[in-house]
Regions:
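Glycine-rich, highly charged phosphate/nucleotide-binding loops
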Residues: 50-69, 86-92
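ADP-ribose/adenylate-binding Rossmann-like module
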Residues: 97-114
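Short, charged/polar "capping" segments at the starts of alpha-helices
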Residues: 15-16, 41-47, 112-115
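Rossmann-fold NAD(P)-binding glycine/threonine-rich loop
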Residues: 86, 109-131
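Rossmann-like NAD(P)-binding element
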Residues: 72-89
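N-terminal phosphate-binding or glycine-rich loops at protein starts, especially the Walker A/P-loop
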Residues: 1-32
């Protein structure tokens, strides 16, 4: 798998607020998680912090440390779940630094990175993607009820 990813947890790794990270640490078919950026738990293994099982996923204290130890990286994933889905302002510098080093950002929060002009401009400048997974598709791409399911025959 080539989708090598760094999880950004902003100090929440050892809390329930990092449930996105917890799931990805346990396993992912889409991404190869190669590290976690979490200053309070830096130097430990992410699996050990999560549930006591070593998974060979190092925790680092900075983006520069991640880049020097874990390269190549393709993605940084905002791997926390906050009250209201708000992006903590404290994460913005790490996100910007990741973008400046060519990492696309995957964001599962309800606050969209694509709504932040400075982040969008930076991503365009460095040729990376901002993937807001919770952003709904445009209305013209949505599928509406057609009744087609009623044509399916199935044994009872």
């Amino acid at each position: 798998m080539n989708n090598r990813a760094l999880l950004l947890t902003d100090g929440f790794l050892a809390t329930p607020n990092a449930k996105t990270a917890h799931g990805l640490i346990r396993g992912s078919e889409r991404y190869t998680v190669v590290g976690v950026l979490d200053k309070p738990t830096a130097g430990q293994d992410a699996g050990v912090v999560l549930d006591g099982h070593n998974r060979g996923i190092p925790i680092v204290a900075s983006v520069s440390e991640a880049l020097s130890q874990l390269a190549p990286l393709q993605y940084a994933i905002v791997a926390i779940a906050t009250n209201g889905g708000v992006l903590p302002a404290s994460m913005l510098n790490d996100i910007k630094e990741c973008i400046e080093h060519g990492l696309s950002i995957v964001n599962g929060l309800h606050e969209f990175l694509n709504d932040k002009p400075d982040i969008v401009t930076l991503a365009q400048q460095y040729g990376v993607e901002l993937i807001d997974v919770r952003r709904p598709k445009p209305r013209n791409e949505l599928h509406f009820w057609t009744g087609e399911v009623n044509q399916i025959t199935a044994p009872i």
